[in-house]
């Protein structure tokens, strides 16, 4: 099957044409639409060829059912950072980026129905340490700072997010935890959730992931033969990663 690729003067791909049947002139075209700054704004797959080959010069993705079902759409802010993405058949996904351009918050259609956002907060080295859900953040405040975990307190977790020992430099409204990740050392073993877990192997784990705390979204209670045998899954599943002297995972 023949595939033809067309580019503009900047080298951006604007059309990819698959020749399905050369004799009958059957083709499947995918168009790539850019803005004046060269940022990809639309991808129009072959399912939209009836629209793209018509004499109509403009289309509205908000009112065209075909575009909502099949088109890829991307929107950027004045810093050229992605703030909205729409994939075929799905509701838009919104992003809020901090001053470094890191997407800290995002919201898809399902989260929007519950007025919730997903947060992803790194440490000062850019490693993901906190992921979870919260109510609508202060977008203006997020855009003006480098959002990260600025301190850890594993002895007194009252001021940390969901008892993780992590304290970010931005307020989260009604947060819930999905995952917390730990690096470099094993000080987090002081947390109540890690009670009974121990590390083994090398003491030097700098630069390596040493543990995780993952939330159990729907705790399940199993009833045994009697009420005394009732068991409930924990609200978090915790794990510790140990390394040998050559930084290989030991357990």
Stretches found by the model and what they are:
Residues 1-251:
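Beta-strand elements of repeat-based all-beta scaffolds
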């Amino acid at each position: 099957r023949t595939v033809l690729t067309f580019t503009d003067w900047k080298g951006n791909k604007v059309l990819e044409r698959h020749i399905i049947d050369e004799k009958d002139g059957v083709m499947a075209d995918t168009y790539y639409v850019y803005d004046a700054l060269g940022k990809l704004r639309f991808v129009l797959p072959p399912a939209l060829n009836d629209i793209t080959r018509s004499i109509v010069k403009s289309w509205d993705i908000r009112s065209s059912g075909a575009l909502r079902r099949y088109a890829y759409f991307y929107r950027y802010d004045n810093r050229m950072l992605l703030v909205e993405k729409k994939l075929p058949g799905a509701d838009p996904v919104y992003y809020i980026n901090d001053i470094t351009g890191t997407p800290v918050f995002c919201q898809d259609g399902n989260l929007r129905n519950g007025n919730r956002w997903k947060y992803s907060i790194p440490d000062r080295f850019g490693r993901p340490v906190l992921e979870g859900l919260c109510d609508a953040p202060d977008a203006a405040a997020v855009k003006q700072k480098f959002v990260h975990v600025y301190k850890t307190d594993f002895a007194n977790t009252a001021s940390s997010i969901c008892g993780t020992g992590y304290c970010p430099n931005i307020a989260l409204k009604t947060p819930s935890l999905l995952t917390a990740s730990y690096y470099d050392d094993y000080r987090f073993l002081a947390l109540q959730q890690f009670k009974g877990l121990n590390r083994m192997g090398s003491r030097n784990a700098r630069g390596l992931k040493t543990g995780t705390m993952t939330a159990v979204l729907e705790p399940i209670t199993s009833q045994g033969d009697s009420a005394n045998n009732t068991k409930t899954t924990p609200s978090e599943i915790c794990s510790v990663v140990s390394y040998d002297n050559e930084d290989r995972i030991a357990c």
